[in-house]
Amino acid sequence: MTNAKFVDVTQHTSFMTFEQQEENPKLERPKLQKFLADAGLCSRRAGESWIEEGKVTVNGTVARLGERVSPLDDVVKVNGKVVRAQLPKLVTIAINKPKGYTCSNHDEFADRLIFELLPNRLLQTRLFCAGRLDVESEGLVIVTNDGSLAHRLTHPSQQIRKKYQLEIKQPLAGEHIPLMTQGIEDEGEFLRIDEIRAKSKSPVGETRLDIILGHGKKREIRRVFGHFRYQIKKLRRVSIGGLHLNKLPLGSFRELDQKEIDLLLPR
């Protein structure tokens, strides 16, 4: 082995939820000889020879030819030295999702997927959504290959505030506001709106509202307003944490720098 680099793979991992791993085939389980070749140690054929000769172990067990490994979870060694997993460069992107796009990497029933809005150069590493919008909604969605960031953005304990612009057909009744902010039960799940605002001093009687959530369960705004028989004309997410859509056109994207990523997270 010439110029081979070894390092403890656990120093290069990012936490990913099961759902994110399921939606991220790029971090699937490649065959061991491919993993070795991708790490720059050898050709696939040479890797096969090393495996057959018993030089390779996976999690302390002598490897078998054709065995698959997880680059993030398994510890692979060649002649007792840990192999560095060649993880992709971390990328985080803001997308202004139009209505009609599904926030998923694969969905056989979806007409269009959000990743179709990105150029091929950004799809060389498999991205996943760090929080979703339903197909009928539009606005700010964060996609990334950074599992640790995605976990922080989606974990309920973070309470990251998200702002939505909501348009309903019927004027908002004043008696419904405290009920929405106190919370309701729907399909055995507790749902609530953190804040309801309007451009006027009071949201009562308004049809265009600003909604604030510090959590965000599946279709939560639609379910809460639907509970009170409101019909939703439009729902748009305009900010996550301190990051705003600003002038990002509908259907467009922007790669985020570290300062913008930091805006997403609570201080």
Across the structure, where does each feature detected by a protein language model lie?
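Basic, flexible Lys/Arg- and Gly-enriched helix-loop patches that mediate nucleic-acid binding at interfaces
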Residues: 3, 9, 15-267
